[in-house]
A protein has these predicted regions:
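Alpha/beta catalytic cores of nucleotide-metabolism and tRNA/nucleoside-modifying enzymes
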Residues: 1-21, 95, 163, 185-209, ...
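Active-site entrance/lid segments in N-terminal catalytic domains of soluble metabolic enzymes
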Residues: 1-206, 234-239
Length: 320
């Protein structure tokens, strides 16, 4: 075993203030995930089946970010969700897996003028991920940005960079309803993961911090650690635009929120993300996520406004 190193997550640090002449209204939150994909805000909605379908993707895109349509859908259903977003002339992404059958999904997605394809797995430093990346690169348009993940080390970053992806997604187990670190004992605290992955990136490849964002200040910390954008799940879940019905319980309103490694999500199709697709007996799934109720929050635009407002407040103190 390698020597144990100290590792940090967002809660372990704060950012030191700097001399600044910048006002919040003067701050630019624009970012590029590739030469083809520019965002007005550095926010992506997570490819989770209780977070992003067309309604969420449309709302996030209108605010300047991009939503990634989850893959716990049939190919036809996912294409339908993508078309709803593209019909509004908005940017949208779509998640794909690594199973051999997933390439058929990819072939249909690339016909939709998709802006972003995300190879969405729990372990991006693997041969299956490499295989699907090489296949996607052969058929995708130059206009489509290719992202792969998730990883947490510089070695994994070098691996994906050599394969020619545009963006790398970082995060092994930081999500609020992900239990990978408990079940498998695997993971790297998110801030340290970002700093390490950054060492393995070449200058052209961008980085997304995926998971662990609980406050707007965490976005600022992720960007300070080298991320070009963040992917958010729990903070956007429970909003009007998130999939699922509103549930009333003891006079309060809720929506269902679950990890893609939960039993419910794996039963719907995400078992492939955790390399358990070949397990025919669903009772033998080893879940790496949980499911529960999350407070209903209303329109997602209000949440995004608070997140970007907090980011601007941080940048006014840090930007010279």
């Amino acid at each position: 075993m390698d020597p144990i190193k100290e590792a940090l997550t967002f809660d372990d640090v704060t950012l030191a203030p700097q001399y600044s002449k910048v006002l919040p209204s003067e701050v630019s939150t624009k970012t590029y995930l590739s030469n083809q994909l520019k965002l007005d805000i550095p926010i992506l909605s997570s490819a989770m089946d209780t977070v992003t379908e067309s309604k969420m993707a449309i709302a996030v895109a209108r605010e300047g970010g991009i939503g990634v349509i989850h893959r716990n859908l049939t190919i036809a259903q996912q294409i339908s969700e993508i078309k709803k977003v593209k019909s509004k002339n908005l940017k949208v992404g779509a998640a794909v897996g690594t199973n051999e059958s997933e390439f058929n999904r990819v072939k249909n997605i690339v016909k939709q003028d998709i802006d972003l394809i995300v190879v969405d797995t729990a372990h991006g430093h693997s041969q299956k991920v490499a295989d699907i990346i090489l296949k996607i690169k052969k058929i995708k348009s130059k206009k489509t940005t290719l992202c792969a993940g998730n990883i947490a080390t510089a070695e994994a970053a070098r691996f994906l960079c050599k394969l020619g992806v545009d963006v790398i997604k970082v995060g092994i187990g930081p999500g609020s309803i992900c239990t990978t670190r408990l079940v498998a004992g695997i993971g790297v605290p998110q801030l340290s993961a970002l700093l390490d992955v950054k060492k393995g990136l070449n200058k052209k490849v961008k980085m997304i911090s995926d998971g662990g964002i609980k406050f707007s200040g965490d976005i600022a910390k992720a960007l300070a650690a080298g991320a070009d954008a963040v992917m958010i799940g729990s903070m956007l879940a429970g909003t009007s635009e998130a999939p699922g019905k509103i549930i009333k319980k003891k006079g309060k309103l809720f929506k269902i929120f679950r990890g893609m490694g939960s039993v419910g999500a794996m039963n719907k199709g995400s078992a492939d993300r955790y390399f358990q697709k070949k397990q025919k007996d669903k009772s033998k799934y080893v879940p790496e996520g949980v499911e529960g109720l999350i407070k209903y929050k209303g329109d997602v635009s209000k949440t995004i406004h608070k997140l970007t407002g907090g980011l601007r407040s941080s940048m006014k103190i840090l930007v010279r």
